[in-house]
């Protein structure tokens, strides 16, 4: 099964995401800050990366996604966000270029798994 890296500074979200994905048969590696997230992605080469858009670190999820893309990491990136709902903004791939898909917080297990499966299938087609 696919390996997924989940990077989020909120341990509740990190634990819930891991539990949801593992229950569906995915291998999950986690990090609770951008530095550790960068390291685990480089070390484990996951099939999918899940990032929180805002983390209490100098680098947020968007900066980390940009860093991966600049280094040639083509792995699909799904981003957790609560910003679009709070600001009434509709995120799109064109606006947030390095990210392939978004999931709104609070996270729906079915929506998360659906988007993960969609991105993994799309990556296999390439």
Please name every model-derived segment.
Residues 8, 52-53:
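Active-site residues of response regulator receiver
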Residues 30-39, 60-61:
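Helix N-cap/capping motif at the beta->alpha junctions
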Residues 59-63, 70, 83-103, 110, ...:
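Alpha4 helix (beta4-alpha4-beta5 surface) of REC/receiver domains from two-component response regulators
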Residues 44-51:
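Active-site beta3 strand of CheY-like receiver
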Residues 117-126:
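The C-terminal output helix
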Residues 9, 79-85, 106:
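Conserved active-site segment of CheY-like receiver
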Residues 42-44, 68-74:
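Conserved phosphotransfer cores of two-component systems
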Residues 11-29, 97:
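Two-component/phosphorelay signaling modules centered on CheY-like receiver
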């Amino acid at each position: 099964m696919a390996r997924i890296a989940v990077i989020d500074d909120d341990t509740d979200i990190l634990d819930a995401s891991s539990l949801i994905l593992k229950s569906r048969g995915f291998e999950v590696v986690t990090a609770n800050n951008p530095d550790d997230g960068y390291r685990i992605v480089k070390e484990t080469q996951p099939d999918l990366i899940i990032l929180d858009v805002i983390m209490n670190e100098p680098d947020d999820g968007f900066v980390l996604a940009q860093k991966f893309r600049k280094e040639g990491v083509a792995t699909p990136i799904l981003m957790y966000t609560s910003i679009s709902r709070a600001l009434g903004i509709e995120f799109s791939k064109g606006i947030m270029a390095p990210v392939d898909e978004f999931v709104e917080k609070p996270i729906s297990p079915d929506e998360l798994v659906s988007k993960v499966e969609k991105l993994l299938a799309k990556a296999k087609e390439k």
